[in-house]
């Protein structure tokens, strides 16, 4: 990048020559910097956000490497600076420079790509920030897997294993970012409303002291159009999934344990092992003898769906054994498993189901009975209990059904108290808009606009042995599953991802 060879004028840290395709000059990043002459804009300018608390020590190491290879001013530690402030400052500067006739600013803004390294919650945080900016041409986002589940990176071909942090690995990743294709995905709006209680708390309880722990789900102000007198209203958004029930409870316990003992969570393998142990402890592999109502979705809430835009609300019957319900937008949950799968031809005809796309305005609703049910996903054509595809879904909580429930949005769990004397607690999910991701090969997500995506469902007849959607068949199957002396998990299966 000719024209900014001085360190004060935005040079990349050495060695920088091979990476001029990505480096952004200081005067673009910092409005107070002196403008310098730049002959040519980088062809793939990137701004990098890294959660230094993710991946044990990997986050901090990754920051160091990116700052060695790029302009330090374009690499941000999310524990030190919020992305909304960074991007607001950057885009305000873009507009100022473009109004002054700067062609470099125009080219960099047009070609800008964002990189976010962290867990699914971190990636969702950045997606929310970009959505909130409401830009006419929002920058597409690439995700570096640096968490426990890494569902978002896996969905778009970036893998699910935590990366190495040496310079060659980072250079290779940047090369993939440059070649990656853009893919739109649906954004989902979530609103929760409850009557203001006479006594007792009803605020969502955040298990993590991170700046974004409940960024995607916060209480609306009194002036917000969604606010209603006498009610507490919360709003947020998600891109991968919303879940409620036992899986969210296990996730909550994991995050709480990590907060209490951070020194025990230094690598991905340890984290996954701890996750599996907590699942066993919480009864996710074996239902409690007392069958508490908080673990049975049907006893907890009535569920209604609207199948298509402008359609009618209709009640969705939930089998009594379902202890976890997942509203899924992407084909990756619990570390890369696909709970929806691809419905067979008979299912399509009988139940009006379609192949899952990430940009079709529909969300897949899947139920799980317990973690053993999750093991079905490992079988060919295996899937959870397909409940519905919907444009909107509403949970109406029964009065006094439970003191609390557990919820999770894109990897961020919380314990949600419920007022005992209120039968008006409602959670509603609806399609909002779309954001743009960067996809690399092999990409699990499918777009309705991609000619290579299957526009119809598979020819298999949906192997009922794997779905076990009949209650009696499930009970009999559960007694037998895993009972043989020769039964064992395949070597490549990580049991931590089955929760």
Curated annotation (Swiss-Prot):
Pfam families found in the cross-reference section: DAGK_acc, DAGK_cat
Signal sequence, start to end: none
Gene name as annotated: DGK1
Catalysed reactions listed for this entry: a 1,2-diacyl-sn-glycerol + ATP = a 1,2-diacyl-sn-glycero-3-phosphate + ADP + H(+)
Membrane-spanning parts: none
Protein name per UniProt: Diacylglycerol kinase 1
UniProt record similarity statement: Belongs to the eukaryotic diacylglycerol kinase family.
GO biological process, one term: phospholipase C-activating G protein-coupled receptor signaling pathway
Function field: Phosphorylates the second messenger diacylglycerol (DAG) to generate phosphatidic acid (PA), another important signaling molecule. PA is required for plant development and responses to abiotic stress. May play a role in disease resistance responses to pathogen attack. Modulates root architecture by regulating the ratio of DAG and PA, which have opposite effect on the promotion or suppression of lateral roots vs seminal roots. Suppresses lateral root number, but promotes seminal root and crown root thickness.
GO terms for cellular component: membrane
UniProt xrefs under PANTHER family: DIACYLGLYCEROL KINASE, DIACYLGLYCEROL KINASE 5
GO MF annotation, one: ATP-dependent diacylglycerol kinase activity
Region (Disordered): 442-479
